[in-house]
């Protein structure tokens, strides 16, 4: 299975990381636009009397637009590279955001949100091959983790700036001038700083390198399914956290926006740490399964705490928001590694299409559920999605280039478990304590009296 270049030909480490940082900034600007309407929901309710379900639908418009073009951008990515795609996509997103900011009708506003989402899809697909092409396997988890902080950092900045911008403006929609400016700057940065990684030309590639990876196994399909299911908690927490804090816990817009920003910054740090963790254990997908289990537990706790109106509900919401964003970088890294350099763009486009379908459908569905039954039942339903993802994760599949490291880690875990079960230290000396003594007696076949 081809994974692209494994060394940075002609580029220093600093130059490679600069490319990752620029890719991060470009993608973060796009996500400020994609998720920006969610932070306009309080202003839309107050200024225009927009119902929560309708406001949730408006916040989904960029996602609907992304669904229409993600695979197309992925195809262009495989053909022309990241530099062109990021530049053109950022420029088009800037134009659409500026036009949406000056719309007075809801229909016109929604239409430009869809068009902007179609353009912003370019930034969502691009960047993965920059990591797989410029970084060796043992650094890709960390590099992709840094690159994938774009979404939570973009959302954090949007949560901090857009509600204040909307409150200070005559129209809530004028707040979208902020992402329009950022996307215009991003287009310039892409031209100046992005360098596409080296790879063979299409006519020089072997038949195996050009072969459809979906015909070889179900691994990519399972990763797509998992990432789509785990997108629901991420979308629900991002969309409704601000209004939930304001309506249910009487937070001011400044405080609520600050808490959303805090959760996204923590999520960004978490993505980097989880990416590094995946490099160390030699697996991208085993941590994803652990994150799925954590998501189920946290959302169940949040539903219960919110039902009781407990003060612990707010930190649980922050925790749920953090856990919900941790997995995405691992799945994107796995896609680029398994799909190879000639299919990674289309594979990421397909994965992001499934994610955006869930992201587009979740806000109006959960907005209606919240309006009719309240937040606790909505959180319970939201927790079912990571629960469904747990058995689908192909956790035993090892990334190309890290098989030896993964097997070494498995051997070390087995050796630690055997040592623990034996009741001795690794050098053979007995461990102190009643538990170790019972383990030694059990190993020798002697009866062990229950503790009193």
Task: Cite the ranges covered by each PLM segment.
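Flexible cytoplasmic inter-helical loops of multi-pass small-molecule transporters
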Residues: 192-213, 401-413
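Helix-to-loop junctions at the C-terminal end of transmembrane segments
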Residues: 69-81, 271-283, 370
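Cytoplasmic membrane-interface "Motif A"-like loop-to-helix N-cap segments
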Residues: 79-89, 280-293
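Conserved MFS/SLC helix-loop-helix module at the cytosolic interface between two early adjacent transmembrane helices
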Residues: 68-104
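Extracytoplasmic gate region of multi-pass secondary transporters
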Residues: 37-39, 219-264, 268
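C-terminal transmembrane helical hairpin of 12-TM major facilitator-type secondary transporters
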Residues: 285-331
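Cytoplasmic helix-loop-helix junction between adjacent transmembrane helices
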Residues: 112-151
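Helix-loop-helix hairpin linking two adjacent transmembrane segments in secondary transporters
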Residues: 146-194
């Amino acid at each position: 299975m081809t994974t692209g270049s494994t060394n940075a030909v002609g580029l220093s480490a600093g130059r490679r990381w600069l490319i990752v940082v620029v890719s991060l900034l470009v993608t973060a600007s796009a996500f400020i636009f994609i998720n920006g309407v969610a932070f306009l929901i309080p202003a839309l309710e107050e200024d225009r009397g927009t119902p929560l379900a309708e406001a949730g639908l408006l916040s989904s418009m960029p996602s609907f637009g992304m669904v229409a073009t993600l695979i197309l951008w992925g195809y262009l990515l495989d053909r022309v590279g990241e530099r062109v795609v990021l530049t053109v996509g950022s420029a088009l997103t800037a134009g659409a955001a500026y036009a949406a900011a000056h719309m007075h009708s809801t229909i016109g506003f929604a239409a430009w949100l869809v068009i902007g989402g179609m353009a912003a899809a370019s930034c969502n697909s691009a960047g993965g091959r920059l990591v797989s092409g410029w970084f060796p396997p043992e650094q890709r988890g960390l590099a992709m983790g840094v690159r994938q902080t774009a979404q939570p950092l973009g959302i954090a900045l949007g949560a901090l700036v857009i509600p204040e911008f909307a409150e200070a403006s005559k129209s809530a929609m004028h707040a979208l001038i902020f992402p329009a400016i950022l996307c215009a700057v991003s287009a310039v940065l892409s031209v100046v700083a992005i360098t596409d990684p080296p790879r063979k030309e299409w006519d020089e590639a072997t038949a195996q390198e050009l072969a459809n990876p979906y015909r070889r196994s179900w691994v990519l399909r399972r990763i797509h399914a998992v990432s789509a299911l785990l997108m629901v908690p991420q979308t629900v927490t991002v969309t409704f956290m601000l209004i939930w804090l304001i309506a249910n816990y009487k937070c001011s817009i400044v405080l609520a926006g600050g808490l959303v920003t805090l959760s996204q910054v923590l999520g960004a740090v978490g993505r980097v740490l989880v990416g590094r963790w995946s490099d160390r254990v030699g697996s991208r997908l085993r941590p994803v399964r652990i994150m799925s289990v954590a998501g189920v537990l946290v959302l169940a706790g949040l539903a219960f705490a919110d039902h009781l109106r407990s003060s612990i509900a707010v930190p649980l919401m922050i925790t749920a928001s953090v856990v919900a964003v941790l997995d995405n970088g691992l799945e994107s890294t796995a896609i680029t590694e398994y799909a190879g350099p000639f299919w990674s763009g289309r594979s990421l486009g397909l994965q992001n299409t499934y994610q955006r379908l869930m992201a587009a459908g979740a806000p109006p569905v959960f907005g209606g559920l919240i309006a009719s039954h309240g937040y606790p039942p909505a959180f319970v339903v939201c927790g079912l999605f990571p629960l469904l993802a747990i058995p689908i994760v192909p956790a035993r599949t090892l990334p190309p280039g890290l098989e030896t490291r993964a097997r070494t880690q498995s051997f070390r875990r087995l050796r630690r478990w055997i040592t623990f079960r034996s009741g001795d230290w690794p050098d053979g000396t007995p461990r102190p304590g009643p538990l170790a003594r019972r383990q030694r007696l059990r190993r020798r076949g002697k009866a062990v009296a229950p503790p009193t």
